Each structure stands twice: as structure tokens, then as C-alpha cells.
Design a protein with these regions (language model features):
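Short, hydrophobic/aliphatic alpha-helical segments
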Residues: 1-4, 26, 33, 134-144, ...
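N-terminal catalytic cores of NTP/NDP-binding nucleotidyl/phosphoryl-transfer enzymes
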Residues: 1-47, 151-157, 163
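Flexible loop/turn segments at secondary-structure boundaries
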Residues: 9-10, 42-44, 92-94, 184-187, ...
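Buried hydrophobic packing segments
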Residues: 19-23, 136, 159-166, 224, ...
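Active-site catalytic microenvironments for nucleophilic, acid-base chemistry
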Residues: 22-25, 29, 139, 165-170, ...
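Well-ordered mid-protein domain cores that form the structural environment of catalytic cofactors
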Residues: 24-71, 76-77
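Divalent-metal (Mg2+/Mn2+/Ca2+)-assisted nucleotide/phosphate chemistry catalytic cores
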Residues: 55-179, 186-188
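Conserved nucleotide- and phosphate/pyrophosphate-binding catalytic cores
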Residues: 166-359
């Protein structure tokens, strides 16, 4: 059972766990689990689902990321039953002649049939030749480890099918492709990603994890229950209680039940002591906000235009951001330069007496 990961970032978020949890299930059924670390392919960058070329990473960055990535993966996987391999072990030994022979097995037409490449070409954007190597390299990984099954997100299907073709040419039985759904981020719009700021990291503090889960929209609950927990939401519970239970279960899974209990208690204490009743919050249309504002500019804009209070940037930094008075869905925002991910229903607290809800 192969699951390949490129450690382009040091942390795992809940979106990554969907495939990792599936690999764990196969471990429990007695199958050999192989976690393939793309220490070579990560320096190229997977173009799947990308509208632009990924920035390159150094090998040193990749290896540093791989160390924390695997450590966090073992919160889910059974360490003793997991084989870890690095694709740099074979790609760094290849001669240029061997690379050309490998490339000769795939046509340009096959590569340009990819939806993301096709969209870029039609949109007049660049597709670099090294990006076209990526599906071939991922496919060759399956040849090297003689994979029977490859797990991945739905965006990996093209790459996995290339692996099947290469295995056939090598006289192997082609691997089975098992794709997992891509998990929507907390904004409910784009897939969960650290670069979008809509993620929940598996190594985050329990309080932060619980608070982030509580910031998810009600519409995401059924999806999160099913994809992350493999169960259906109890429709007999009030939506708020169902969301608390979801947040508790996720926090307990990556920490423990005691930490989840404390995180829930802390969140409920803060929630119950809010100075403003939720129903009384002024509403602000997201579409009415100036584009590309960072947190500092947004808070300044809201103070002045919603509450008719003008504050200097220095005061906002010192009296609001630094002490953690700025909270998005009860999660403290201390970085004035951050770009906040706003969704309908999100509540931004500016101070004890000032808060808005977005629509």
C-alpha cells in the first residue's frame, strides 16, 4: 500500500490526514504500508491543481520538513508497521540516459491532456518542462517499490494512472488507484491549505485546534463528520452542540480526551462571557470590503466605518493585536500583516465592546 507525500511544508493539516487515515486502516487489516517521502520530487513541486508553477525548494528545506512531517504522521500510523522510503534514493542515481529512456515512455499529448496543464496553456500561462516530469517520476516510484495499491487525493488520479502504465511496461501487475476526497478548508470554498490560511494543523495546541474547528460553517459539519471521522452527524443534536462534539472528537484524536475536555471548557467559558449577544452584532457584507486588506487595515476600516471610532495603527497594534483582543471566530489574531479568511457567518471581535459578523 503506497502513499506518497512531498514534504513541501513542515506540518500536516486535516486535509492530509484523509489519505493517511486510510493507510492506517489498511495497516490494521494486515497490509504492508509504505510511506514514500518525495525528497526528490518535492524539489520540483507537484503541479496537480496548480494554476501557476510552484516555487522550488532546496533539498535541505525538504529534509527538514520531512522530519516533522513523518513525526506528525505517526500520530495516525503505526510506526512499527510503516516502511518509510525516499525517492531520492533512486532518482539521484539515474544517469541522463536513463532519464531520457524513462521520458520516452510518455507522450507530450498525454501530459497536455491534464486538465491543469490544459487550462494553463489555454490561459496563456507557462507550463515548465520540469513540471511535466512530475507525473512520470511519481509513476516510477510505483515501479521501484512494486506498489499494489496507491492512495492519493482525487487530484492525484492522473499521476497514479501514469504509474499503472509504467508498471505494465515493466511486466508488473498495474497498481489499483484509490483516491480520497479533497477536504474543504474552514472557509468552505477552497481545499484545505496552509497557504490559504483555512487549515487545522494536527500539531496545533488543543485550544487552537478546538477553536478553529468551531469557526467552521454549519454547512461543513456533515462533510467533516463523514470525511474526517467516517460517521454521520447526530441530527438530533442542536447544530452548536454537534459542532462542539465534532471539535472535541478531532481534538481528542490528535491529543487526548483530557486535552479535548479542557479545550472545550475554555472555549465555552470564553463564549459564554462575551460582552455582546450574537444576535446584536452589526453585519458587514464581505463583498463591500476593499480588496486585499491585511488584518490591520481591516480592523482600522471596521472601527472607522462601522463604529465611527478612529484609531492609529500604533494604537491598534499595541492595544488590540499584541494582547490578543482581535479574535476571528474566537481564535486570537496577533499578526497585523496577516490576511484573514472571511466567510459568511464569521465573527471578528475587535475589542470587548466591538465585534461584527460577516455576511
Amino acid at each position: 500500500m503506497k502513499l506518497g507525500v512531498d514534504p513541501t511544508a513542515p506540518d500536516i493539516h486535516l486535509g492530509h490526514t484523509v489519505a493517511i487515515e486510510k493507510l492506517r486502516q489498511f495497516q490494521e487489516l494486515g497490509h504492508q504500508a509504505v510511506l514514500l517521502i518525495g525528497d526528490f520530487t518535492a524539489t520540483i513541486g507537484d503541479p496537480s491543481g496548480r494554476s501557476v508553477t510552484r516555487p522550488p525548494l532546496s533539498r535541505e528545506q525538504v529534509l527538514e520538513n520531512a522530519e516533522t512531517y513523518t513525526k506528525q504522521a505517526f500520530k495516525i500510523l503505526d510506526r512499527d508497521k510503516t516502511e518509510i522510503v525516499y525517492n531520492g534514493d533512486w532518482f539521484r542515481k539515474m544517469t541522463y540516459e536513463e532519464v531520457l529512456k524513462l521520458n520516452s515512455r510518455v507522450t507530450m499529448q498525454q501530459m497536455l491532456a491534464r486538465e491543469d496543464f490544459k487550462a494553463r496553456v489555454e490561459g496563456g500561462k507557462e507550463v515548465r518542462l520540469h513540471e511535466m516530469q512530475y507525473p512520470i517520476m511519481q509513476g516510477w516510484d510505483s515501479v521501484e517499490i512494486r506498489a499494489d495499491v496507491e492512495l492519493g487525493g482525487t487530484d492525484q488520479l492522473f499521476n497514479i494512472l501514469v504509474g499503472r502504465d509504467l508498471q505494465k511496461e515493466e511486466g508488473m501487475l498495474p497498481q489499483i488507484a484509490m483516491t480520497m476526497p479533497l477536504l474543504e478548508g474552514l472557509d468552505g470554498v477552497r481545499k484545505m491549505s496552509k497557504s490559504y490560511g483555512n487549515y487545522v494543523g494536527v500539531d496545533e495546541a488543543p485550544e487552537m485546534m478546538f477553536g478553529k474547528m468551531m469557526s467552521a460553517s454549519d454547512e461543513l459539519m456533515d462533510r467533516y463528520y463523514l470525511v474526517l471521522l467516517g460517521e454521520k452527524r447526530d441530527m438530533g443534536l442542536h447544530p452548536m452542540e454537534a459542532k462542539k462534539l465534532l471539535a472535541w472528537k478531532i481534538t481528542a484524536r490528535y491529543h487526548d480526551s483530557a486535552a479535548a475536555d479542557t479545550a472545550r471548557s475554555d472555549w465555552e467559558t470564553r463564549f459564554s462571557k462575551r460582552d455582546l449577544a450574537a444576535a446584536d452584532l452589526p453585519e458587514v457584507e464581505i463583498a463591500s470590503l476593499p480588496a486585499d486588506m491585511n488584518a490591520l487595515a481591516l480592523v482600522s476600516f471596521l472601527f472607522e466605518n462601522v463604529f465611527q471610532v478612529k484609531k492609529s495603527n500604533g494604537v491598534l497594534r499595541k492595544e488590540h493585536f499584541t494582547p490578543g483582543a482581535i479574535q476571528l471566530n474566537d481564535v486570537k489574531m496577533t499578526d497585523p500583516s496577516a490576511v484573514l479568511e472571511l466567510a459568511p457567518g464569521s465573527v471578528l471581535r475587535l475589542s470587548k465592546k466591538h465585534a461584527v459578523r460577516f455576511k
